[in-house]
Structure formats: C-alpha cells, structure tokens
Swiss-Prot record:
Gene label: rplP
Keywords tagged on the record: Ribonucleoprotein, Ribosomal protein, RNA-binding, rRNA-binding, tRNA-binding
Cross-referenced NCBIfam families: rplP_bact
Name under which the protein is recorded: Large ribosomal subunit protein uL16
Top-level taxon of origin: Bacteria
Subunit structure and binding partners: Part of the 50S ribosomal subunit.
Annotated source species: Vibrio vulnificus (strain YJ016)
Record Pfam families: Ribosomal_L16
Lineage: Bacteria, Pseudomonadati, Pseudomonadota, Gammaproteobacteria, Vibrionales
A GO molecular function held by the record: structural constituent of ribosome
C-alpha cells in the first residue's frame, strides 16, 4: 500500500478539503478517470481500484496513478476515554477535489479503458467520469 517513506511531522490537523484540484488534464496516457465529487481516498481504495483495472486490461497497456496518500489519519482505540493525547496513525489518505485526474491508461482500446475505469470507479467513494486526452 502507498504511504510516505518519511514525513516532517507524524500527525497533522484534520483541516478542510476545499477548492479546486490541480492536475485536471490527462497528461501521461490517452484516457483518464477524473473525480467529479470531493473526498478522501485511502491507500486501500487506491490499491483496490488499481487492482480492478489491472485485472481487466490484463497485461496490455500502462496505468498511471496520479494521486498519492500523504495525509495521516489518526484514530483512538476502542473503549478508550477521551483525552490523553491524539490517537495513533491508522491509515493514509489523499485529499481529492473535483476535477482531479486520478488514474490514466494508455495502449488499450477506448472500450477496454472505459470498462476498466467503470470497475475502478465502483471502488471509489465519490462520483467519477471518463476523460480523453485533448489533442490540439
């Protein structure tokens, strides 16, 4: 699963997930999966979607993952009273804003890419859309 090798700080504030995304264009492949909604994407969800796509397109083409989970999420253990400091880091998330291209694929027909992205989108917690590279 994806997570940073080292970080400056172990724990971060919860913060908010506002604004619009950077990385809104398909830049590496021919087709992309773009977020329509906003939310948190866990490392497990990123990996589950990647596996679904990889299994469908088999060994053809190439897949790019354009998101990285760099925010630690902490949780306190079950049945522990409040206080006594912040909980331990349980998992890592990537914060996703609308318009972010999360996955790209190249070297496969459009129909195959569409179906692979449809399978991947079922693993994600917000709405997505299929996009193609803009040729000028």
């Amino acid at each position: 699963m994806l997570q940073p090798k080292r970080t400056k700080f172990r724990k971060v504030h919860t913060g908010r997930n506002r604004g619009l995304a950077k990385g809104t264009e398909v830049s590496f492949g021919s087709f992309g999966l773009k977020a329509v909604g906003r939310g948190r994407l866990t490392a497990r969800q990123i990996e589950a979607a990647r596996r679904a796509m990889t299994r469908h397109i088999k060994r053809q083409g190439k897949i790019w993952i354009r998101v990285f989970p760099d925010k630690p999420i902490t949780e306190k253990p079950l049945e522990v009273r409040q206080g006594k400091g912040k909980g331990n880091v349980e998992y890592w998330v990537a914060q996703i804003q609308p318009g972010k291209v999360m996955y790209e694929v190249d070297g496969v027909p459009e129909e195959l890419a569409r179906e692979a992205f449809r399978l991947a989108a079922r693993k994600l917690p917000f709405k997505t859309t299929f996009v193609t590279k803009q040729v000028m």
